[in-house]
């Protein structure tokens, strides 16, 4: 999985399979959602009024919006703006990642880390984003006769203003390292005890030491 930033184009001009924008309950738009709404002649506000409550963990896919180059706009519910914290942000990123995986997309762009939330920095939110995506992509098939279908999602871009690229990139790098570590731990935990023996764990530890000296 490749994580990187996108800052070279206006949101409505980004060509991507899916662009995630966050919206709060009570029809409150994030700055990114407002940009897309203006570029699409109010399409986002119309949907919020009629069919999307924006509860945390929910999403709605809009296709072929006028004035928008992204194939899909994925509205991601953030819940109540006053209660939006790191946990809700991670849920939002996970919701979008699961959608992209289920839709078998190869790449996607998210604006979710750019949404301010209480007690966090952009770096922390970027780290949380990478962790959420890697967690969503975890599959265990090491001991199964039928292997899990390969995840097609290989590139996850985070849209941020140019002035914030370095902070975002640092967070993505941090989150990638943590996410890979968590997934490796999950793999070990999922292995049967006749395979994941103390000797096997010691061998894995030695290999990690060689890979990450």
What are these regions (language model features)?
Residues 1-213:
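Short amphipathic alpha-helical segment within the helicase RecA-like ATPase core
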């Amino acid at each position: 999985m490749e994580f990187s930033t996108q800052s070279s184009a206006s949101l409505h001009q980004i060509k991507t399979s899916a662009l995630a924008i966050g919206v709060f309950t009570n029809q409150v738009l994030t700055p990114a959602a407002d940009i897309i709404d203006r570029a699409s002649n109010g399409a986002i506000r119309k949907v919020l009024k009629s069919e999307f409550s924006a509860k945390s963990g929910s999403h709605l896919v809009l296709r072929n919006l006028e004035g928008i180059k992204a194939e899909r706009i994925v509205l991601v519910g953030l819940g109540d703006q006053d209660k939006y914290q790191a946990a809700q942000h991670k849920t939002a990123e996970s919701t979008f990642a699961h959608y992209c995986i289920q839709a078998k997309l190869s790449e996607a762009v998210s604006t979710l880390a750019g949404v301010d939330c209480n007690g966090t920095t952009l770096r922390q939110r970027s780290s949380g984003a990478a962790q959420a995506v890697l967690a969503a992509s975890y599959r265990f098939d090491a001991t199964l006769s039928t292997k899990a279908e390969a995840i097609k999602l290989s590139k996850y871009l985070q849209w941020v203003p140019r002035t914030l690229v370095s902070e975002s990139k640092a967070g993505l790098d941090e989150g990638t390292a943590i996410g890979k570590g968590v997934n490796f731990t999950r793999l070990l935990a999922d292995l049967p005890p006749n395979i994941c023996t103390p000797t096997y764990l010691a061998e894995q530890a030695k290999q990690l030491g060689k890979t990450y000296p």
